[in-house]
Amino acid sequence: MSTPSGSNPLPMADKLEAKGRIASIKFDYVKNGQPKAGSTHGVSYHNFTEWFDLNHTCDEHILSVKCYYDDGEIQGLVIKTNIRTSAYMGYNIGTTFTLEVKGKKIVGFHGSFDKNLTSLGAYFAPLSPAK
């Protein structure tokens, strides 16, 4: 799972879809000003989906992702942007780790999956200067 080749990584996570104990994850994005549906990573066998959309009209961007890890799998996620914090996606059980670098924003993701998401990492870029 990585930034699509040739795309602008800044709007990478326009829309995040997470299912179950994070059985699958999907990132829709914008390429050359056009919305693109990302690929689903993992297995989509759960009946519910949780979405998190970024609002680019107010320059919303992801600052961090808190991950819950247990039994070899990502159990849940909480996304923090420069404007708000998401509700729990998945389950808030297990050991936590946070994808975050001070003074930077998340512009893409990478990871691995088996039956569920087993690892998640992030690509970072400097924050844009305030206008």
From Swiss-Prot:
Family classification: Belongs to the jacalin lectin family.
Disulfide bridge partners, by residue number: none
Keyword Oxidoreductase included in the entry's annotation: no
Taxonomic superkingdom: Eukaryota
Descriptive protein name: Jacalin-related lectin 15
GO biological process: defense response to virus
Taxonomic source organism: Arabidopsis thaliana
Tissue: Expressed in the vascular and surrounding tissues in cotyledons. Detected in root apical meristems.
PANTHER family referenced in this protein's UniProt entry, alphabetically: GENOME ASSEMBLY, CHROMOSOME: A06 (PTHR47293:SF21), JACALIN-RELATED LECTIN 3 (PTHR47293)
InterPro entries noted in UniProt: Jacalin-like_lectin_dom (IPR001229), Jacalin-like_lectin_dom_plant (IPR033734), Jacalin-like_lectin_dom_sf (IPR036404)
Residue ranges occupied by any Jacalin-type lectin domain in the UniProt entry: 1-126
